[in-house]
UniProtKB/Swiss-Prot annotation:
<dbReference type="InterPro" id="IPR045864">
    <property type="entry name" value="aa-tRNA-synth_II/BPL/LPL"/>
</dbReference>
<dbReference type="InterPro" id="IPR004154">
    <property type="entry name" value="Anticodon-bd"/>
</dbReference>
<keyword id="KW-0648">Protein biosynthesis</keyword>
<keyword id="KW-0963">Cytoplasm</keyword>
<dbReference type="InterPro" id="IPR041715">
    <property type="entry name" value="HisRS-like_core"/>
</dbReference>
<dbReference type="GO" id="GO:0006427">
    <property type="term" value="P:histidyl-tRNA aminoacylation"/>
</dbReference>
<keyword id="KW-0436">Ligase</keyword>
<dbReference type="GO" id="GO:0005737">
    <property type="term" value="C:cytoplasm"/>
</dbReference>
<dbReference type="InterPro" id="IPR033656">
    <property type="entry name" value="HisRS_anticodon"/>
</dbReference>
<protein>
    <recommendedName>
        <fullName>Histidine--tRNA ligase</fullName>
        <ecNumber>6.1.1.21</ecNumber>
    </recommendedName>
</protein>
<comment type="similarity">
    <text>Belongs to the class-II aminoacyl-tRNA synthetase family.</text>
</comment>
<keyword id="KW-0030">Aminoacyl-tRNA synthetase</keyword>
<dbReference type="InterPro" id="IPR006195">
    <property type="entry name" value="aa-tRNA-synth_II"/>
</dbReference>
<dbReference type="Pfam" id="PF03129">
    <property type="entry name" value="HGTP_anticodon"/>
</dbReference>
<dbReference type="GO" id="GO:0005524">
    <property type="term" value="F:ATP binding"/>
</dbReference>
<dbReference type="Pfam" id="PF13393">
    <property type="entry name" value="tRNA-synt_His"/>
</dbReference>
<dbReference type="GO" id="GO:0140096">
    <property type="term" value="F:catalytic activity, acting on a protein"/>
</dbReference>
Length: 431
């Protein structure tokens, strides 16, 4: 006999937890729709040359290859690269700026460890332009994710953001050539600490003086306005750096103008995002009181992601919530509601009154009351235990007395109170 088990890194929930997860997912989707994003669905399987078009070495290591095929196929690593392919294929049919959302599973060859998943849901929004895309969209993406996170009642959070042009311009100013390696090392600062970052920077041939100067730059802090003023006062003679500072300032002001609480936004010069395709604004989101959890929502601007698929310039900006990981984290912190059910009541007939229960069930359903009938030949105690296990608030009892009076006993399972009510009274109470 085969011992049933689920592979590590895969999510599989009991019904009551799945209901909570689906509710969170639906609330996020409702916000995306309210903000005028269109839903798309791309294949889980893509050609490897599509998946690896921009990801670099780390992405290549984590992509699941399909072994039984010689066609070089794999499972999608994220939803952004397939989006670039999608927009490139259908750009003649799309209206730009193209506003898209996608909530779907992605797959990564992660190590078996706590907080890492091989299959997980991502909730993505992106805005893609044709030849140009206003920086205003960077701010609008943040505003939409701000609303999405607020809708699911997570703890207080903070969008931390930066602009890669600032970092790349500063690297150039210091005479550092290997931008991408530097960005990847800085991206690890929160995880491995400053001493290990120094060691890794030295391994890419940065001398001690440049390392100290760079780290001192990354530590620039204060209010958001103070950080912007400090950056401007450095008088760095580098066009890319100046462009990045101006973009950072513009996006920050637009974020505030859209109604995001200033307490929920923070400029952090060490935010880089590890993926290679980001070119401007970059965002990471953290719980203020649970920083150890890591980023719960991230993204940024990518001006050249679709270059491998089309000669057209398709700049974009997007953000993503790793929903599976976020859900488990909220569970561990006891920040998601406990048992829930997705229907209003269970009808429990006494023996011989099953047909009455079925008729009542149909009448209630026709009146938009979500319900079911317990029709198994079990003792009354077992029937009530069933309702209790499903966390159903109301039970309707049908027996001889109820049928003779053409009424029904409505029992509140939370406090034990019972009422003898007519059908229309029950419908009004349950709807």
């Amino acid at each position: 006999m085969i011992q049933p088990s689920t592979l590590p890194g895969m999510m599989e929930l009991l019904p009551e937890d799945q209901l909570v997860f689906d509710t969170i997912k639906r609330k996020i989707e409702d916000v995306f729709i309210k903000n005028a994003f269109f839903s798309i669905d791309t294949p889980a399987i893509e050609k490897l040359d599509v998946l690896l078009s921009k990801g670099g070495g780390e992405t290549s290591k984590q992509v699941f290859r399909i072994d039984n095929s010689k066609k070089n196929q794999g499972l999608r690593f994220d939803l952004t690269v397939p989006l670039a392919k999608y927009v490139s294929m259908y750009m003649q049919d799309l209206a730009f700026p193209f506003r898209r959302y996608q909530i779907a599973k992605v797959y990564r060859g992660e190590r078996n460890q706590k907080g890492r998943y091989k299959e997980f849901y991502q909730c993505d929004i992106d805005i893609i332009g044709n030849e140009k895309l206003s920086l205003y969209n960077d701010a609008e993406i943040v505003k939409c994710m701000y609303e999405a996170l607020k809708s699911i009642d997570v703890p207080e959070f903070e969008f931390q953001f930066n602009n890669r042009k600032i970092l790349n311009g500063y690297f150039s100013y210091l005479g550092i050539d290997d931008f991408e390696s530097c960005l990847r090392v800085i991206d690890k600062l929160d995880k491995i600490g400053i001493d290990n970052v120094k060691e890794e920077l030295s391994k890419i041939n940065l001398d001690a003086s440049k390392i100290d100067t760079l780290l001192k730059f990354l530590e620039i802090d204060g209010t958001n306005q103070e950080i912007i003023e400090k950056l401007e006062s450095l008088n760095i003679d580098n066009e890319l750096f100046t462009c990045g500072v101006n973009e950072l300032k513009f996006v920050y002001q637009d974020i505030l103008s859209l109604g995001v609480n200033p307490e929920n936004i923070k400029i952090n010069l060490s935010i880089t995002r590890g993926l290679d395709y980001y070119t401007g604004s970059v965002f990471e989101t953290f719980f203020k009181d649970y920083r150890e959890i890591g980023s719960i929502c991230s993204g940024g601007r990518y001006d050249s992601l679709a270059n491998n698929f089309t000669k057209s310039k398709l700049p974009g900006v997007g953000m993503s919530i790793g929903l599976t990981r976020l859900f488990y984290q909220l569970q561990e912190l006891n920040l998601v509601k406990g048992k829930q059910t997705n229907f209003d009541c269970i009808i429990i007939p006494m023996k011989g009154y099953e047909k009455n229960a079925v008729k009542l069930m149909n009448d209630l359903r026709n009146s938009s009351v979500k319900c079911m009938s317990y029709l198994e030949d079990d003792k009354l105690k077992k029937k009530f235990n069933y309702a209790d296990k499903l966390s159903v608030k109301y039970v309707i009892i049908i027996g001889q007395d109820e049928v003779e009076q053409n009424k029904f006993t409505l029992r509140n399972m939370e406090n034990g109170n019972q009422e003898l009510l007519e059908l229309n009274e029950i419908i009004e109470k349950l709807k």
